[in-house]
Amino acid sequence: TLKEKVRLATILGTFQATLTNFKYLRNVWKKNTEEERLLGVSLTGIMDNKLPSTTGNTLEVMLEVLRDTAVQTNAAMAKQLKIPQSTAVTCVKPSGTVSQLTDAASGIHARHNPYYIRTVRGDNKDPLTQFLMSQGIPAEPDVMKPDSTTVFSFPMKSPSGAITRTQMN
């Protein structure tokens, strides 16, 4: 179930909160990390699920249950690990790359439109940028950094029946 997935992700995140020895950062960050132990359990594609996105306050209730699951799981695991409980636990955040990799709507947002253009920026010295250009992917110089950055455009199609922002009130 989704609740079990949130519980397991929270356990992993709480384990991760014990990793505070950042050799490449100043000690103030180690201190901050050990005090706050922030925890993010990322849900994405929420609006791709028809039930919570279309029926009254179902989404709100579901997110509250999942948040409570994450907070309670974190408290129990922190106690076992003898570390402070996280000062903040979040279950929804903006999503970019993960939603693209899984073809899911970003975070809690509906998809943009049935058809849209997805843009991706690349540094002109990056071999991937050079490869995309050599393959004829539509591209143009970035308006803010035309000498160093290229913007690629990819046509996108939302899945059939996907909820789009134009359907939201």
Mark where each language-model region is.
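Internal maturation/activation junctions in enzymes
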Residues: 20-27, 45-94
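Electropositive phosphate-/nucleotide-binding environments in soluble metabolic enzymes
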Residues: 40, 64, 68-71, 122, ...
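Terminal amphipathic helices with adjacent charged low-complexity linkers/tails
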Residues: 37-43
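Short, electropositive, low-hydrophobicity segments enriched in small/polar residues
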Residues: 44, 49, 100, 111
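Short capping micro-motif at the N-terminus of alpha-helices
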Residues: 87, 100-101
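Catalytic alpha/beta core of large soluble enzyme barrels
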Residues: 1-25, 32-35, 94, 101-169
